[in-house]
């Protein structure tokens, strides 16, 4: 490797460094040798990470060599070097006054970046150098722990507590192996990143977390996320000693934000209430122990191994402290406009003093809180969520972070540090309320609108000064977007004698930069508040994007100011058809809000760009988002970057307002005007730095090239251009005509593609590892589906998911993929009863129910299960099972059972216990708010659990269903198909539910054509209204001629329609008639059978005499919905099913009894006295009888429909008509799990094709089919 001598230090570099890289390394050495701080900006792609590593490690080796020479000189006492005195060797070892006499005095290097993924890239760069230092990378237990029980804990603080408990009791065998195996060559010598630590730890059965802490003691360079350094609590937890170290912050443009956030907090009513609930539990538990006497108390504490060593009085005092804190916050008067009130930072000490939290008491309070958390660690249940207590501990440590000097009052210390802070108290706007507490200790705060206590730090200098006070030798801040450096240094309030603003290493033909003030249609492009959502601006921006996508090859990045702007733009473009035009050129990928889906989407984008024959892809992201922070879009992955606006912070946000006010106050106090930023300058820099970070994605190395499009007219202003990076400004050009933009960009890429070498193709990492050939096909299928899902806009943009799931627009294949991906609920989940009653049953049976996942479920359910597993990439399998002796999927208990198994698979044991206790509380108290609070914590955070939250709708009590749907939509962007009829009590929704298998949900949709009421012919109408049904009954009893419930003709004539509406008006009144007419019109337009039936059922089932109106409404139901309408009518009217009593399914009279003609008249086969029904039914029957070869086809068709009411007996000689083939047989056979009936021949054909019942999905055998036994007619 080439060697470069800089400032007397020889640096081994992987290649001959460029001039800008030599300049950068020289500045780094200047900081190290002079023990001063530095701010170094070097554009992305200039190799600053490699320069930092090589320079600092070369400097350490130089010091080490000097110390070695000194040791040798001391040992031989100058005999071998008589001409050189010992003092000259010592001066060589002393770096500008440092007293370095031994190897331990050589400074350690602490390399900090924002995330572990960025640190992994840094460690990869280190492996490419010739240096092989001792390396350590620090991480959290969440990332490094391999103990199965600890990993199950949901929260980080619970993992910490349980880990500490196991370490203290020596019950973690991974920790017990650390001392023995930490010196093994494979663990101590190589350069390991976070993944290597976990892999080697699992291989050698040694704890990676404590192994890294051991390696830290001997490491030359330590890698860690920089919140470990900036947060005093984290520094203490990881035992980080900063004295004499060299600290490097890479990607330091985020340091300001992290400094402020690590020293700030927001205390919500939920946090206080959660802490009080936990203390309540401990208090009650210890009180019960005390009542059993001293001997019993010792026995219980010994068996539980809780380690709690607190008096009952101390626990009660701790609860009083929290209650007083809650009262003090609630007592603050707020203005009536919900803006909140702001007080100086010192007010926090007054507020906490009212709750007896002071410098003098903080130690005892923190120790007590820690003991309670340790006491509850590892427990399960609703009261074991100690996150509230942990947050209170963190808050107390932040407020009282600076201990007072001896003899000085604590208030003065507080005043000295609090001028960097503001206290802001504002109403809680979140709907996630804590459940009301009902004990005598509770205050009324939880029953009012809560107040949030915010303690915000507005100066990063508070944390930076604290860092320097730890004895740091040199502090280096570096990034690609720090400009302007002077203002950045002013914010930190510590001296930075060394500054550098480096140019780029690229030539002029590798970068094109243009400001585009107007779109192709001449409309001004602007992301200003008053224009960003205007249709003209959105349309012009969409047209500009489409034109740019035509000329930019391969990957195109589009950055929006915020998520709402991106989502609104996509919504408009999709409505106008613009997104389809762009997708035809380059498929669209959208940056998701949640971190879990991001890697999936970005991998799909990379593969789309790299796929052979592809025109590339478009990636839509937001400034300050995940895609703009250190992600690699080199070469083809990012040939163009479009910035659609200046991403200013929200101007009306209280924190932004107070930050600007704070800076203005600080500037006013400083007599020298240039020593502090003003609020407006800070506001401008926040936008410009976000833009600079986004455009830094385009050039990633020396031979990369690309174009930058600044699509906002405000980029043409001089002040906006002045805040762009120095390497961009020389290439910037403002265009007044969009056509010239396209011409120049096309010319630029033609030249660049000829001049620049082709990029080395990167091998696509296979998702199939060795030894997994057996599942390769499934993995590839999953990956393909995952890619399609990543391309679906609806998946990642909540505003595009507002239409009901299951109704994608015509031709929208991407939307159909979205629906396919998101429908992870099962058909059995959509029933409105049975979950609460099945809790105890589920607890007994769930453990043994994982072996029959697909054997007893319906085909559609099995298909949905397979899809859901594939679409999740095989990360977790949710297997829904039933035992033969258990209720099948169609029953209420079966549906509840399957839902509970899915929930148990998705949640940890602790969270599942919380779920069950919340349900039991809801069952006993009907407390809907408490239920929602629990469900939100369990299912709302993880998008993969949104389907479970939505599926819970079926079990919510009717009077809470509408509220639940609104909350579900707010949290997930999905609705629960609420209809007005869902709010009826269960008894009114279905009078015979207890005796039925369970109501089927009406899923299929139909369309009522325009003017249907005018197209119906009364002459051809089968059931001419209720009077016809009640007076013209069949005289011979032939069921082929007996009208079924709701089975009316296909074309009701205008007289029949008028008669029906007239009867509705007379029976229900004008208001109800208008409501029914409106529902029918809506049914004609939206094709939603659920909606119209909900309205009709609500209107016609209130009184028994109105049930005939429900039946007669069948004249408007189309043929393919007749079976479901029949079943719904039967359920609502309480008609018995087959085998449970016989009653003709015809409308009832005023007394709701069967007409006498049905029970006394001798019924024999024969034509009906009703002419039109006779003609219609006889044609159908004769058609079926004349074509026996079609019976199987007819049967197959009927088998796909839900089970309809069983046919009535036809003759006194026990003859019946099969509903499928319409042939007569002496006996019908019935499914043992439902009311599905067929003749022997039809059952034989069905069982040969499938053993699953077409109606309920139960597994049937020939021996299990039950013969239908009828009472002999009198």
Swiss-Prot record:
Its EC number is 5.6.2.-. It is found in: Nucleus. Keywords: 4Fe-4S, ATP-binding, DNA damage, DNA repair, DNA-binding, Helicase, Hydrolase, Iron, Iron-sulfur, Isomerase, Metal-binding, Nucleotide-binding, Nucleus. [4Fe-4S] cluster binds at residues 145, 163, 172, 207. Residues 982-1002, 1014-1038, 1143-1198 are annotated as: Disordered. InterPro entries: ATP-dep_Helicase_C, DinG/Rad3-like, Helic_SF1/SF2_ATP-bd_DinG/Rad3, Helicase-like_DEXD_c2, HHD_RTEL1, P-loop_NTPase, RAD3-like_helicase_DEAD, Rad3/Chl1-like. Its main location: nucleus. Residues 1186-1196 have a biased composition (Basic and acidic residues). The PIP-box (PCNA interacting peptide) motif mediates the interaction with PCNA and localization to replication foci. This is Regulator of telomere elongation helicase 1. It comes from Rattus norvegicus (Rat). The gene is Rtel1.
């Amino acid at each position: 490797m080439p060697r470069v001598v800089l400032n007397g230090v020889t640096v081994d570099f992987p290649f001959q460094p460029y001039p800008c890289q030599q300049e950068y390394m020289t500045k780094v050495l200047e900081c190290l040798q002079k023990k001063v701080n530095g701010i170094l900006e070097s554009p992305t792609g200039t190799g600053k990470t490699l320069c930092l590593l090589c320079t600092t490690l070369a400097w350490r080796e130089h010091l080490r060599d000097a110390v070695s020479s000194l040791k040798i000189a001391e040992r031989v006492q100058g005999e071998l070097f008589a001409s050189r005195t010992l003092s000259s060797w010592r001066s060589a070892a002393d770096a500008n006054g440092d007293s370095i006499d031994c190897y331990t005095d050589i400074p350690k290097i602490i390399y900090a970046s924002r995330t572990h993924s960025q640190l992994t890239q840094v460690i990869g760069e280190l492996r490419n150098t010739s240096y092989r230092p001792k390396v350590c990378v620090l991480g959290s237990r969440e990332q490094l722990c391999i103990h199965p029980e600890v990993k199950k804990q949901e929260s980080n603080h619970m993992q910490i507590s349980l880990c500490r408990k196991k370490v203290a009791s020596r019950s973690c065998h991974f920790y017990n192996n650390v001392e023995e195996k930490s010196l093994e060559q494979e663990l101590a010598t190589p350069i390991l990143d976070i993944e290597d630590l976990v892999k080697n730890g699992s291989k050698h059965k040694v704890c990676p977390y404590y192994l890294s802490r051991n390696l830290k003691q001997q490491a030359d360079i330590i890698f860690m996320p920089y919140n470990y350094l900036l947060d005093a609590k984290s520094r203490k937890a990881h035992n980080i000693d900063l004295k004499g170290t060299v600290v490097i912050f890479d990607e330091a443009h985020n340091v300001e934000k992290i400094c402020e956030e690590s020293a700030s907090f927001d205390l919500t009513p939920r946090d206080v209430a959660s802490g009080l609930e936990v203390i309540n539990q401990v208090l009650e538990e210890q009180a019960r122990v005390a009542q059993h006497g001293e001997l019993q108390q010792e026995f219980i504490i010994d068996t539980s191994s809780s380690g709690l060593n607190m008096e009952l009085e101390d626990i009660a005092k701790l609860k009083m402290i929290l209650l007083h804190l809650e009262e003090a916050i609630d007592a603050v008067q707020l203005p009536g406009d919900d803006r909140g009130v702001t007080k100086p930072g010192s007010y926090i000490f007054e507020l906490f003093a009212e709750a007896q939290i002071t410098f003098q008491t903080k130690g005892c309070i923190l120790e007590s809180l820690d003991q309670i958390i340790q006491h509850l660690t590892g427990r399960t249940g609703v009261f074991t969520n100690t996150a509230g207590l942990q947050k209170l501990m963190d808050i107390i440590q932040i407020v009282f972070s600076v201990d007072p000097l001896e003899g000085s009052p604590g208030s003065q210390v507080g005043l000295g540090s609090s001028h960097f802070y503001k206290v802001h108290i504002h109403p809680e706007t979140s709907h996630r309320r804590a459940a009301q507490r009902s004990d005598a200790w509770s205050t009324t705060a939880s029953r009012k609108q809560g107040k949030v206590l915010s303690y915000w730090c507005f100066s990063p200098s508070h944390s930076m000064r604290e860092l320097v006070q730890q004895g740091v030798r040199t502090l280096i801040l570096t990034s690609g977007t720090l400009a302007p450096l002077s203002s950045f240094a002013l914010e930190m309030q510590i001296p930075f004698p060394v500054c550098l603003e480096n140019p780029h290493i690229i030539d002029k033909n590798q970068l094109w930069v243009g400001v585009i003030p107007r779109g192709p249609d001449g409309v001004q492009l602007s992301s200003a508040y008053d224009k960003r959502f205007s249709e003209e601006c959105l349309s012009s921006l969409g047209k500009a994007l489409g034109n740019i996508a035509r000329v930019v090859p391969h990957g195109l990045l589009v950055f929006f100011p915020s998520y709402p702007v991106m989502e609104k733009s996509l919504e408009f473009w999709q409505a106008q058809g613009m997104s389809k035009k762009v997708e035809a050129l380059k498929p669209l990928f959208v940056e998701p809000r949640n971190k879990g889906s991001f890697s999936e989407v970005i991998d799909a984008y990379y593969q789309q760009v790299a796929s052979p024959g592809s025109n590339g892809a478009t990636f839509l992201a937001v400034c300050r988002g995940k895609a703009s922070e250190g992600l690699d879009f080199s070469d083809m992955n990012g040939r163009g970057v479009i910035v659609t606006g200046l991403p200013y912070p929200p101007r009306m946000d209280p924190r932004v307002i107070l930050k600007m006010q704070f800076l203005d106050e600080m500037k006013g106090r400083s007599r020298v005007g240039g020593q502090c930023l003003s609020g407006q300058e800070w506001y401008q820099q926040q936008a410009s730095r976000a833009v600079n970070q986004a455009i830094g994605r385009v050039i990633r190395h020396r031979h990369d090239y690309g174009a930058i499009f600044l699509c906002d007219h405000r980029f043409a202003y001089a002040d906006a251009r002045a805040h762009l990076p120095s390497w961009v400004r020389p290439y910037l050009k403002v265009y007044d005509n969009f056509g010239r933009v396209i011409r120049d960009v096309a010319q630029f890429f033609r030249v660049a593609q000829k001049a620049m070498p082709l990029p080395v193709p990167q091998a696509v990492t296979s998702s199939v590892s060795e030894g997994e050939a057996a599942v390769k096909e499934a993995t590839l299928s999953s990956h393909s589906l995952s890619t399609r899902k990543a391309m679906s806009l609806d998946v990642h943009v909540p505003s595009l998911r507002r239409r009901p799931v299951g109704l994608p627009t015509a031709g929208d294949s991407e939307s159909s993929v979205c629906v396919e991906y998101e429908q992870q609920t099962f058909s059995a989940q959509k029933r409105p009863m049975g979950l609460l009653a099945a809790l105890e049953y589920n607890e007994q049976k769930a453990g043994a129910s994982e072996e029959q996942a697909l054997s007893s479920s319906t085909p559609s359910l099995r298909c949905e299960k397979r899809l859901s597993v594939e679409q999740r990439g095989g990360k977790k399998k949710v297997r829904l099972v039933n035992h033969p002796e258990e209720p099948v999927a169609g029953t209420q208990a079966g549906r509840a059972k399957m839902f509970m198994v899915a929930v148990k698979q998705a949640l940890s044991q602790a969270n599942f216990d919380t779920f069950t206790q919340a349900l039991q509380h809801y069952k006993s108290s009907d407390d809907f708010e408490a239920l929602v609070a629990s469900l939100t914590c369990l299912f709302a955070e993880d998008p993969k659990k949104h389907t479970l939250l939505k599926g819970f709708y079926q079990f919510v009590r009717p009077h809470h269903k509408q509220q639940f749907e609104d909350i579900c939509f707010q949290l997930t962007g999905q609705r629960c198909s609420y209809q007005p009829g869902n709010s009826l009590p269960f008894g009114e929704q279905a009078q015979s539910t207890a005796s039925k298998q369970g109501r089927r949900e009406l899923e299929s949709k139909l369309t009522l054509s325009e003017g249907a009421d005018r197209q119906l012919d009364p002459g051809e109408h089968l059931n001419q209204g209720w009077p016809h049904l009640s007076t013209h009954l069949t005289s011979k009893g032939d069921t082929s001629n007996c009208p079924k419930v709701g089975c009316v003709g296909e074309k009701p004539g205008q007289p029949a329609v008028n008669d029906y509406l007239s009867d509705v008006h007379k029976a229900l009144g004008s208001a109800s008639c208008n409501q029914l007419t409106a529902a029918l019109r809506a049914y004609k337009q939206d094709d939603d059978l659920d909606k119209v039936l909900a309205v009709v059922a609500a209107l016609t089932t209130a009184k028994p005499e109105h049930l005939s109106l429900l039946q007669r409404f069948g004249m408007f139901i189309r043929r393919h919905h007749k079976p479901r309408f029949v079943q719904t009518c039967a359920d609502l009217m309480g008609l018995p099913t087959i085998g449970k009593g016989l009653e003709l399914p015809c409308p009832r009279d005023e007394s709701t009894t069967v007409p006498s003609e049905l029970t006394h008249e001798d019924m024999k086969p024969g034509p009906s006295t009703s002419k039109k029904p006779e003609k219609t039914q006889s044609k159908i029957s004769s058609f079926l009888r004349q074509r026996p070869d079609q019976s199987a086809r007819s049967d197959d068709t009927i088998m796909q429909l839900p089970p309809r009411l069983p046919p009535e007996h036809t003759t006194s000689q026990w003859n019946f008509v099969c509903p499928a083939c319409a042939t007569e047989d002496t006996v019908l056979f019935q499914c043992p799990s439902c009311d599905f009936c067929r003749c022997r021949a039809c059952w034989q054909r069905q069982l040969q094709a499938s053993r699953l019942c077409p109606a309920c999905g139960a597994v049937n055998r020939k021996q299990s089919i039950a013969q239908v036994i009828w009472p002999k007619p009198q």
